[in-house]
């Protein structure tokens, strides 16, 4: 039984991943009709939220029929992410999700999204600060590592759990792979089978 805080997702939950320019309200409504157990908004820039940018604020709109639903944020600065998480909480989502997986150059090369996989201590610190800043359950979406030499996801997942996240979604590729090659589900399984892990672990990549 998958459970995030007090949210019961059943035995084999299907999640709608947060996708920029895809996971908007009409698409979410369609996915909900077809059985999505948990959905997320498009990712939202932490800097955009704290600057009250219209495009970012508009993505906070969620509807009762969508529940349970999470709002996802991304950013490179701990203070901005902490403040953005608090803003998200005011929109009353069920979950606040942190994007540590976006591989796109304009995001990752600024240290946000998958870019933070090059600085695991910062990733852990940022997560801890966000968890402390909000009352809603915090989840994370990330990748196996930055490249083939840094696939530290088993250790990283455990460290993120230790600072308070309540679920983790893992894309079975590195940032260097982008969306090429095949997703490595064996490493996702290694996280799931780690006896020290007790939070839900969701797999992402090549799901069909």
What are these regions (language model features)?
Residues 1-208:
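Flavin-dependent oxidoreductase catalytic cores
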């Amino acid at each position: 039984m998958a459970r995030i805080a007090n949210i019961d997702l059943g035995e084999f939950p299907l999640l709608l991943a947060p996708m920029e320019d895809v996971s908007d309200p009409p698409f979410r409504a369609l996915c909900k009709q077809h059985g999505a157990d948990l959905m997320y908004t498009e990712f939202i820039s932490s800097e955009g939220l704290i600057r009250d940018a219209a495009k970012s604020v508009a993505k906070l709109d969620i509807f009762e029929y969508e529940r349970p639903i999470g709002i996802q944020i991304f950013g490179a600065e701990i203070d901005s992410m902490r403040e953005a998480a608090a803003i998200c909480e005011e929109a009353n989502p069920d979950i606040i999700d942190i994007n540590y997986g976006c591989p796109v150059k304009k995001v990752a090369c600024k240290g946000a999204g998958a870019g933070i996989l090059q600085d695991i201590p910062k990733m852990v610190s940022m997560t801890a600060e966000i968890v402390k800043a909000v009352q809603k359950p915090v989840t994370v979406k990330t990748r196996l590592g930055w490249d083939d030499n840094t696939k530290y996801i088993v250790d990283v997942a455990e460290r993120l759990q230790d600072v308070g996240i309540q679920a983790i979604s893992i894309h079975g590729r590195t940032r260097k792979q982008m969306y090429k090659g095949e997703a490595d589900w064996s490493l996702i399984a290694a996280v799931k089978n780690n006896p020290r892990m007790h939070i839900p672990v969701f797999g992402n990549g090549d799901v069909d």
